[in-house]
């Protein structure tokens, strides 16, 4: 069955998430949840690192490096929404594992994995 997308942008986003997921799995992370949503936030990928750390991952894709590229598009407001969703997700767990926030930035011919891109204390702070 072919997935149905509301827009070309959503289709490109899903393909970017597929690329990020495959890359992270090659580096030992295991998928837990994809596209976790709650009121006020969303997380593209939730994965578990080999050491048990729960990794919340924002996937960003840009076709050009204008305006700082994909990684720069994870604004303080976006960080706050990811953290909000992560806190909601963590509240559903019986035990709180260690966690971190990563960004996977994609551009034509390039994938950059930024581990510990932001954290609970710095999310939402401007530059």
Swiss-Prot record:
Gene3D superfamilies for this protein: 3.40.1350.10
A Pfam family per the record: UPF0102
Alphabetized InterPro entries for the sequence: Restrct_endonuc-II-like, tRNA_endonuc-like_dom_sf, UPF0102_YraN-like
The organism's place on the tree of life at top rank: Bacteria
A GO term for molecular function: nucleic acid binding
Family: Belongs to the UPF0102 family.
NCBIfam families per record: PRK12497.1-3, YraN family protein
Name of the protein: UPF0102 protein Reut_A3265
Organism annotation: Cupriavidus pinatubonensis (strain JMP 134 / LMG 1197) (Cupriavidus necator (strain JMP 134))
């Amino acid at each position: 069955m072919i997935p149905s997308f509301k827009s070309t942008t959503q289709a490109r986003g899903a393909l970017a998430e597929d690329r990020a997921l495959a890359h992270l799995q090659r580096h030992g992370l295991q998928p837990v949840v994809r596209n976790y949503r709650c009121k006020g936030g969303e997380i593209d990928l939730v994965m578990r690192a080999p050491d048990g750390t729960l990794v919340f991952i924002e996937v960003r894709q840009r076709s050009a490096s204008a305006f700082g590229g994909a990684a720069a598009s994870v604004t303080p407001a976006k960080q706050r929404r990811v953290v909000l969703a992560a806190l909601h997700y963590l509240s559903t767990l019986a035990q709180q594992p260690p966690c971190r926030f990563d960004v996977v930035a994609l551009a034509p011919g390039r994938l950059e994995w930024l581990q510990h891109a932001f954290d609970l204390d710095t999310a939402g702070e401007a530059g």
